Design a protein with these regions (language model features):
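Low-complexity, highly charged intrinsically disordered N-terminal segments
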Residues: 76-158
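Outer-membrane beta-barrel initiation region
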Residues: 150, 281, 285, 329-473
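Outer-membrane beta-barrel "beta-signal"
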Residues: 456, 620, 639-650
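Active-site nucleophile-His-acid catalytic modules used for acyl/amide transfer and hydrolysis
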Residues: 233-308, 568, 633
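Repeated loop/turn-to-beta-strand initiation elements of outer-membrane beta-barrel proteins
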Residues: 462-469, 504-512, 550-558, 587-597, ...
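Glycine-rich catalytic cores of cysteine/serine-nucleophile enzymes that process amide/ester linkages
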Residues: 158-243, 456, 485-493, 589, ...
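Transmembrane beta-strands of outer-membrane beta-barrel proteins
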Residues: 437-441, 477-479, 513-521, 555-563, ...
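Transmembrane beta-strands of outer-membrane beta-barrel pores
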Residues: 443-449, 460-462, 480-489, 501-505, ...
Length: 650
């Protein structure tokens, strides 16, 4: 229907004014598609809106999951979705009924909406699918759109199943210390060997190229938008396994064909919008889990994470909900090399160490005298090592790539099969480790003053905690606070508080020369200058080295050079700044018993000029996956502290 130009008759301005009021009313009710609905079946639209209201569809769990509504403190709801283009009603972020009515109205329109510029039926296919299930749309009165772009996208997956992928933590990247999760779409025509060609569904913050330390701050407060994307799995494997040297765990989810379809439909919808990315709360693990909820809304997964979300905890939530099936590990390139080297004879290991430094030793008579199968195994392991170090890219990786070409050329001349070596990650299955939060209840003495204490840690793991499921020799403690009640004068106080305490011990050997490091920010009480329990602010950083032996079971020796600043009313000028060092040992005595010894000396040259000698002895005995016993002794000048505690992880 077209418009033709003509001269207005005297009575027509009034009609035009009434028409204008009607248009304004419709736009106010359904801002994006009300006009388009005029050309459709308005009576049928009203009927659908009425039926949806009678059935209370806007209150249904499924609708709230699709719109990402969460309860507010005032008794209402608000969507976690932060892109206005995700909503068809102006008040859709906080009004489920208005958004449902606007969505139904949008389905009658062919207007292109959202960042993807599609009709509402195609931009929000999961909403259309669910509302059609509830209201049984009459295709003659509400014709379905073909949605060719979605159909092509969906068909390319040829989806059979969904796997949750968990790359283990990476200590040298703040955004990856706790691990990461994303989904892999397993195709019907893929085998376990070819699933590396599958596509993944990933959620991540969109960062500027020069984010640096800025990311750690802005990421905490949601200053970056987070987007969903689909990326080939082999690129993610290259990033995590080959470059970052992180073991990858693959959890096949027990989802039906219908649940897989729902998950992919909602993923398509989220390509239209963004969420504000919060490092501790609404992070990758949280929003990836929301896709699983969309697949099966009856399972309340996100309710378990009201404040913060740690990736491995979402894996545990899936397991406890019965959604985890087969579990497969994909060891890192570093793990592959270390396991192969450990299986070598002393002679093979010596040739491996020579070849990775100087491939021309391939021509040495000693190497040529080895049996062909041994030569092949040494060459393959050397190639794995060189590939690991060439993965960094650019000029830094060029020398390793040149060496690897010589190694591969020599291997191609040997017509023997590869030696089969079982490769298991050094880290046990992450979801089978202890809980990420911990509470300690104990008692002890400080300078002959008895006390009872309780210690609560929000996350994550320290050097003495049971190691299965966690990165060996790594400590990440977040929001740790200890309270004590001293019998003397019945005094209760905060003994220690630490928002962040990180230690990364990286044992050096012929394969790795990564430095160890640590950082600690917090408060602890000190006995100094006549003040028995003065609050003392601490900022400590250190860098050093570690080495590993196996004299008994396993021992790690470490040494740090460090700098420290203190602030307390106990000090002259209320502060002191200095430096020094720490040496120590961390030992696995048995599978259940761990021991730690350390000694420190610091000289404070600024502020309150003083020396500080410290000793620490700690021991932990594991009772079960989530229970342990611990004893600790801390000594500083004129200050001795002993505590016995029972630890519960959750």
């Amino acid at each position: 229907m077209g418009f033709r130009s003509h001269v207005l008759e005297p009575h027509r301005p009034f009609r035009l004014f009434l028409f204008f009021l009607l248009v304004v009313f419709l736009i106010d009710s359904y801002p994006l598609s009300g006009l388009a609905a005029l050309s459709g079946d308005a009576s049928y639209l009203n009927d659908l809106i009425d039926r949806a209201a009678v059935a209370h569809l806007s209150e249904k769990r499924e609708w709230h999951v699709l719109l990402h509504y969460r309860p507010t403190l005032t008794g209402g709801v608000s969507s976690m979705q932060d892109d206005p283009g995700f909503f068809l009603a102006l008040e859709g972020k906080t009004d489920p009924q208005a958004e449902l009515a606007a969505t139904l109205t949008g389905f009658f329109s062919e207007e292109l909406i959202g960042r993807s510029k599609q009709p509402a039926q195609c931009a929000f296919v999961a909403r259309y699918y669910w509302l059609n299930e509830q209201l049984r749309f009459d295709a003659n009165r509400l014709p379905p759109q073909p949605c060719k772009r979605f159909t092509q996208w969906f068909d390319e997956f040829n989806a059979e199943a969904i796997s949750m992928i968990f790359p283990s933590g990476f200590m040298n990247n703040p955004s990856s210390m706790f691990g990461h999760t994303f989904l892999r779409v397993d195709g019907k025509d893929q085998t376990p060997q070819t699933r590396i060609l599958a596509y993944t569904i990933n959620y991540a913050a969109q960062l500027p190229t020069d984010a640096g330390v800025e990311y750690a701050v802005k990421g905490i407060f949601g200053a970056y938008p987070g987007y969903f994307s689909t990326i080939p799995y082999y690129l993610k494997v290259q990033e995590y396994r080959d470059i970052d040297n992180r073991d990858i765990w693959e959890y096949r989810l027990n989802l039906t064909d219908l649940q897989v379809r729902r998950l992919l439909m909602h993923t398509w919808e989220l390509g239209n919008a963004y969420f504000d990315y919060f490092f501790f709360g609404e992070n990758c693990a949280y929003h990836i889990l929301s896709l699983v909820e969309a697949a099966e809304p009856s399972i309340h997964l996100l309710d378990r994470f009201p404040v913060y979300t740690i990736p491995v905890d979402t894996i545990r939530a899936l397991r406890e909900s019965g959604l985890v099936g087969e579990v497969v590990s994909r060891p890192s390139r570093s793990t592959l090399v270390r396991r192969k080297r450990a299986s070598m004879t002393a002679g093979e290991r010596a040739w491996f160490d020579r070849l990775i430094r100087n491939p021309t030793d391939l021509l040495a008579e000693g190497f040529r005298a080895l049996p062909p199968d041994q030569q092949a195994f040494v060459l393959e392991t050397a190639s794995d090592y060189l590939l690991q170090h060439s993965a960094v890219g650019g000029e830094e990786g060029d020398p390793f790539r040149i060496k690897n070409r010589a190694i591969l050329s020599a291997r191609s001349e040997l017509k023997v099969a590869s030696r089969e070596v079982p490769i298991e990650p050094y880290v046990k299955q992450p979801d089978l480790g202890h809980g990420t939060s911990r509470i300690d209840v104990g008692s002890g003495w400080r300078n002959n003053r008895a006390f009872e204490g309780i210690h609560v840690r929000a996350a994550y793991h320290d050097l003495l905690d049971p190691e299965p499921g966690y990165t060996p020799d790594a400590q990440i403690e977040v929001m740790s606070i200890a309270f004590r009640h001293y019998h003397h004068q019945s005094q209760a106080r905060v003994e220690r508080f630490s928002p962040i305490n990180i230690v990364s011990l990286a044992p050096m050997d012929s394969l790795s020369h990564v430095p160890s490091w640590k950082v600690n920010l917090g408060m602890q009480t000190v006995r100094y200058n006549g003040c028995a329990l003065c609050a003392n602010g601490v900022a400590n950083v250190g860098a050093g080295a570690a080495a590993e032996t196996q004299l008994f079971k396993r021992e790690v020796y470490f040494a740090f050079a460090e700098a420290e600043a203190n602030y307390s009313r106990a000090y002259e000028e209320r502060h002191r700044v200095g430096g020094g060092g720490t040496v120590g040992m961390l030992a696995d005595v048995t599978d259940r018993w761990k021991l730690m010894l350390s000694g420190s000396y610091l000289r404070y040259a600024l502020g309150d000029k003083s020396d500080d000698f410290r000793w620490f002895v700690g021991s932990r005995y594991t009772l079960s996956q989530n229970w342990a016993l611990r004893v600790e002794y801390n000594h500083r000048d004129h200050d001795n502290d002993v505590v016995f505690s029972v630890q519960a992880f959750f």
